[in-house]
Amino acid sequence: MAAQLGLVLDCVDPDKLAVFWSVAIGYTTRGRAGTYVLLVDETGRQPKLLLQRVTEPKAGKNRMHFDIETPTVDEEVARLEALGAQRLEALPVEEHGNRWVVMVDPEGNEFCVCNAGQAG
């Protein structure tokens, strides 16, 4: 079997973030074990997301972030804000024909909402 990409996100409360991210990206909670919560895309086309409990809160900017790609950036931002995400910048960034909004999840992990196919 070829290697597959899996993502691990450190967090203080993996159960809380599991609710946010499962609704945000349409994943399903597949299991819990100790300090971990596993989220999966039921189609199997997207990488698994493992939420790992850590004792220290997030400090500083992420070295890597998620892009949520959508044809309707403003509507997606509003939906994610209703789930508990917040904008980091009041206005969208527009550059080289691309448009995105920088946001944070309920624990402050940065991610972007961007035009479909125009990841930033």
Name these PLM-found stretches:
Residues 16, 46, 75:
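Short alpha-helical
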